[in-house]
A protein has these predicted regions:
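Short amphipathic coiled-coil heptad-repeat segments
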Residues: 120, 127-168, 349-380
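Amphipathic alpha-helical coiled-coil segments
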Residues: 336-350
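Amphipathic heptad-repeat alpha-helical coiled-coil/stalk segments that mediate oligomerization
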Residues: 375, 379-409
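Short, solvent-exposed loop/turn positions at domain surfaces
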Residues: 26-27, 94, 194-195, 233, ...
Length: 419
């Protein structure tokens, strides 16, 4: 693979990817794109894009270069393609669209007002959609702010700053010291041949996978099960409702969730850790919150090793400590964290709803633009630019004439080749 030459523009690069491939081939001029060229990705992430790079690129075959004729404004064409793509995605109702064919794209019916009105529409869309994108960017920053807010709440919780808990009210208790005083209260999933894919069943006792343990929330529904016989055989790896689950592997490891109280007993898989908390020492929810704090996450990373994927050393994990106050003070801490997290969740829900409305707003504005609603006053103010030789009808006749000329040239070339 070349490390220099002409960069090859792929869909990943259109979407911000910085991993480039290169070519030393000398290709026909139409296989290259320059800054400002209109492009269309017809696979994966559908839609129109601008070539925004200062140097010449070879565009990948999953990308088309769109060259509007003299009868169509290029910026107007970009927005028309954006509108059509949005309508196609909406009509798919969530079904993945594998690709768009070139012949299919050429059959699209497009809106084509007079050229002057095209430019007016493009200018209005530039202004309106820039405002939409600015609003969207501000909304998209809020979840990151909320993530930092939650971490600051957890940091305050385990330091006593969130409630009236003094620093000397905390005791550093090891993870194994927090476990119930019974066999198998702290452990990892089964190794290798102890649980094979061939042991999986369509029904029975559920398995818990790493993918279900994420950021304080347990994932939806088990997809794999084991038989009652296998379940008994793996009793050391059972997880009970209310147990704390920790990812043993990941990038980084250490995600935490509580196994829901309304779930049946299950079996954790290889890269999970389970902890049954001794309720005389700590509240399960307090332990979960303390383990989600940045301080504890860094401790977990410090005892992890691996190249492709980091894995937690269980022996060292047992010896990690959590700052643990009295049960009474834990109750107050959990109450305050619940309260603040609920507040953050409410804001996040509102933001997600607002983002959905903003995303719909783009398509709504485009639809209005191509129904002529954004330029109604412009047409009244500029009748000379949309009538006579500037009318849409005259534009259509010009396009038909250009097509006839193109057909004649094509036939002439074919005749020469046949010789």
């Amino acid at each position: 693979m070349l490390s220099e030459g002409t960069p090859i523009l792929r869909i990943q690069n259109l979407n911000g990817g910085e991993n480039w491939f290169y070519s030393d081939l000398d290709l026909p001029v139409d296989k290259y794109c320059e800054k400002g060229d209109l492009l269309y990705a017809w696979s994966a992430t559908f839609g129109p894009y601008w070539s925004r790079w200062d140097h010449r690129l070879i565009y990948h075959y999953h990308i088309w270069k769109v060259v509007p004729g003299d009868c169509m404004d290029k910026i107007f064409a970009f927005y028309e393609l954006k509108r059509i793509t949005g309508a196609l995605k909406a009509s798919a109702h969530g079904v993945a669209m594998p690709h768009i064919t070139k012949s299919g794209m050429e059959d699209w019916a497009i809106t084509l007002p007079p050229l002057a009105e095209q430019k007016a529409i493009a200018e209005k869309l530039d202004t309106l959609l820039a405002q939409v994108e600015s609003t969207k960017a501000r909304l998209e920053r809020i979840p990151k702010i909320l993530k930092r807010f939650r971490q600051s709440v957890l940091a305050a919780a385990v330091s006593g700053k969130l409630t009236e808990v003094k620093e000397n009210d905390f005791s550093e208790i090891t993870i194994e010291g927090l476990a119930k005083e019974r066999k198998y209260s702290l452990g990892i999933g089964p190794f290798g041949s102890n649980l094979k894919v061939s042991d999986y069943c369509a029904e029975g006792h559920p398995l818990v996978f790493v993918r279900e343990i994420r950021a304080g929330r347990f994932g939806d529904g088990a997809t794999k099960y084991v038989s009652s016989g296998k379940f008994d055989e793996l009793r050391a790896h059972r997880v009970l409702p209310g147990d704390v689950l920790i990812t043993k592997m990941g990038d980084p490891p250490g995600d935490v969730a509580i196994y829901p109280v309304n779930r049946p007993e299950a079996v954790i898989t290889a890269d999970c850790i389970k902890l049954s908390v001794n309720q005389n020492v700590a509240m399960t929810k307090y332990v979960s919150y303390a383990m989600q704090s940045e301080q504890f996450r860094l401790s977990v990373i410090s005892i992890s090793a691996g190249v492709a994927q980091q894995k937690v050393n269980l022996t060292k994990f047992r010896k990690l400590t959590l700052p643990t106050p009295s049960l009474e003070k834990q109750t107050e801490i959990v109450r305050r964290v619940d309260q603040l997290f609920a507040y953050a969740d409410t804001i996040e829900t509102q933001v997600n709803n607002a983002l959905e409305r903003v995303n719909n707003l783009t398509q709504s504005i485009l639809a209005k633009a191509f129904r002529g609603e954004l330029t109604e006053q412009w047409r009244k103010d500029n009748p000379d630019l949309i009538n006579g030789e500037n009318s849409a009808e005259a534009l259509l006749e010009k396009i038909k004439a250009e097509r006839e000329v193109a057909k004649s040239k094509k036939k002439a070339k074919e005749k020469v080749r046949k010789g």
